[in-house]
């Protein structure tokens, strides 16, 4: 499969700390990136690492380490044709540090339709789980939604915004999907990607806070951008047409 190519443009610097859990890498094979779970899978999963690296080089000014971690984790995960667990990314930092920007970029360069893809699922506690008294219903609905969409397409992305506002019981529903196992609730979930966004504090594995992991990444010299962007032209970014 030939990866789709998009152009990039500078959007400014961003991001606090990135915590990553990924599967080990195997031999690089673009054909393995296609969604192949079930005979009726219609995933629009079309990773464009050149575009992602180009945009991250523009966006993460002074955050070379963060950029490298994101790309390294994604490549390692996607190179493995049979990962033992999903990829879990936790983005956290102060308001305005660009956590949502990074998640939008990932969706944009992994799926043909970006955040509009039917296989990218964006949850906000304020919008989707506003009433604490409805927790049990939310737990049932969330489990059913994740399970059902992974059955349709194992290459799905689940984005959870404002994790600091999410009821703890909902995290418990997600916990079985985040670990190492072959099947959960009869569903193959090991090729999924989960992104958790939290204000300031780090989100530990399975929703537990990780002490001593807050604060901005140390600034490092920005890598030359010309090499990444030399072959690219025109507007791009999440929401761009193309």
From Swiss-Prot:
<dbReference type="GO" id="GO:0005635">
    <property type="term" value="C:nuclear envelope"/>
</dbReference>
<keyword id="KW-0067">ATP-binding</keyword>
<feature type="glycosylation site" description="N-linked (GlcNAc...) asparagine">
    <location>
        <position position="149"/>
    </location>
</feature>
<dbReference type="GO" id="GO:0005179">
    <property type="term" value="F:hormone activity"/>
</dbReference>
<dbReference type="InterPro" id="IPR010448">
    <property type="entry name" value="Torsin"/>
</dbReference>
<keyword id="KW-0325">Glycoprotein</keyword>
<dbReference type="GO" id="GO:0005576">
    <property type="term" value="C:extracellular region"/>
</dbReference>
<protein>
    <recommendedName>
        <fullName>Prosalusin</fullName>
    </recommendedName>
</protein>
<keyword id="KW-0165">Cleavage on pair of basic residues</keyword>
<feature type="propeptide">
    <location>
        <begin position="27"/>
        <end position="189"/>
    </location>
</feature>
<keyword id="KW-0732">Signal</keyword>
<feature type="binding site">
    <location>
        <begin position="93"/>
        <end position="100"/>
    </location>
    <ligand>
        <name>ATP</name>
    </ligand>
</feature>
<dbReference type="InterPro" id="IPR027417">
    <property type="entry name" value="P-loop_NTPase"/>
</dbReference>
<dbReference type="GO" id="GO:0005788">
    <property type="term" value="C:endoplasmic reticulum lumen"/>
</dbReference>
<keyword id="KW-0964">Secreted</keyword>
<comment type="similarity">
    <text>Belongs to the ClpA/ClpB family. Torsin subfamily.</text>
</comment>
<keyword id="KW-0372">Hormone</keyword>
<comment type="function">
    <text>Salusin may be a endocrine and/or paracrine factor able to increase intracellular calcium concentrations and induce cell mitogenesis. Salusin may also be a potent hypotensive peptide.</text>
</comment>
<dbReference type="Pfam" id="PF06309">
    <property type="entry name" value="Torsin"/>
</dbReference>
<dbReference type="GO" id="GO:0016887">
    <property type="term" value="F:ATP hydrolysis activity"/>
</dbReference>
<keyword id="KW-0547">Nucleotide-binding</keyword>
<dbReference type="GO" id="GO:0005524">
    <property type="term" value="F:ATP binding"/>
</dbReference>
<feature type="signal peptide">
    <location>
        <begin position="1"/>
        <end position="26"/>
    </location>
</feature>
């Amino acid at each position: 499969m030939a990866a789709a190519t998009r152009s990039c443009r500078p959007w400014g610097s961003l991001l606090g700390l990135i915590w990553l859990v990924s599967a080990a890498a195997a031999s690089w094979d673009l054909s393995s990136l296609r969604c192949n779970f079930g005979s009726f899978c219609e995933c629009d999963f079309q990773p464009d690492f050149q575009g992602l690296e180009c945009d991250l080089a523009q966006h993460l000014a002074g955050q070379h380490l963060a950029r490298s971690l994101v790309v390294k984790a994604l490549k390692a995960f996607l190179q493995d044709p049979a990962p033992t667990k999903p990829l879990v990314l936790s983005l956290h930092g102060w308001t305005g540090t660009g956590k949502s920007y990074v998640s939008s970029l990932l969706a944009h360069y992994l799926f043909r339709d970006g955040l509009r893809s039917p296989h990218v699922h964006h949850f906000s506690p304020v919008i989707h789980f506003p009433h604490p008294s409805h927790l049990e219903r939310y737990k049932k609905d969330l489990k059913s939604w994740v399970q059902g969409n992974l059955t349709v397409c194992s290459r799905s992305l689940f984005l959870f915004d404002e994790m600091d506002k999410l009821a703890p019981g909902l995290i418990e529903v997600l916990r079985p999907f985040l670990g190492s196992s072959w099947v959960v609730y009869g569903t193959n979930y090991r090729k999924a990607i989960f992104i958790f966004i939290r204000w300031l504090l780090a989100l530990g594995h399975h929703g537990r806070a990780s002490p001593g992991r807050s604060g901005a990444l140390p600034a490092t010299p920005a890598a030359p951008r010309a090499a990444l962007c030399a072959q690219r032209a025109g507007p791009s970014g999440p929401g761009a047409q193309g």
